């Protein structure tokens, strides 16, 4: 089976496969945190060359995707953090949508807006205004917060 791929320039060998999986694990750790970094099967203690070759055969599609992803990043070095920024923006938009939906439900249930915050959601026809940063020292006294937590 490996002989058929040898003529194909897309075939990824053992050394490159090991490096690609190391890169993938490092990327996971930097983006998602070290909670579940993954395991590189090529670095498992006691693995034989035959097992490495079998892993290489099985993982070819994933390895080729990783190689292509790395090549895209090299071509767009200025946009290396583009996906992370896009993901962050999607999450922020989803959070805003969720909060607007919760505010609407609150209005339907109680007839007024929530009194927990000073901000109220206006009609969606108006463009959103630039939000100011909140200085929490104006709203909360640290001693008062400590008393509330101790009660």
From Swiss-Prot:
GO terms for cellular component: host cell cytoplasm; host cell nucleolus. Residues 108-137 are annotated as: Disordered. It is found in: Host nucleus, Host nucleolus; Host cytoplasm. A motif (Nuclear localization signal and RNA-binding (RRE)) lies at residues 84-93. One of its GO terms (biological process) is mRNA transport. Residues 126-136 have a biased composition (Basic and acidic residues). It comes from the Viruses. Pfam families: Env-gp36. Keywords: Host cytoplasm, Host nucleus, mRNA transport, RNA-binding, Transport. Residues 111-120 have a biased composition (Low complexity). The keyword Transport applies. GO terms for molecular function: RNA binding. Homomultimer; when bound to the RRE. Multimeric assembly is essential for activity. The RNA-binding motif binds to the RRE, a stem-and-loop structure present in incompletely spliced viral pre-mRNAs. This region also contains the NLS which mediates nuclear localization. These overlapping functions prevent Rev bound to RRE from undesirable return to the nucleus. When Rev binds the RRE, the NLS becomes masked while the NES remains accessible. Escorts unspliced or incompletely spliced viral pre-mRNAs (late transcripts) out of the nucleus of infected cells. These pre-mRNAs carry a recognition sequence called Rev responsive element (RRE) located in the env gene, that is not present in fully spliced viral mRNAs (early transcripts). This function is essential since most viral proteins are translated from unspliced or partially spliced pre-mRNAs which cannot exit the nucleus by the pathway used by fully processed cellular mRNAs. This is Probable protein Rev. It comes from Feline immunodeficiency virus (isolate Petaluma) (FIV). The gene is rev.
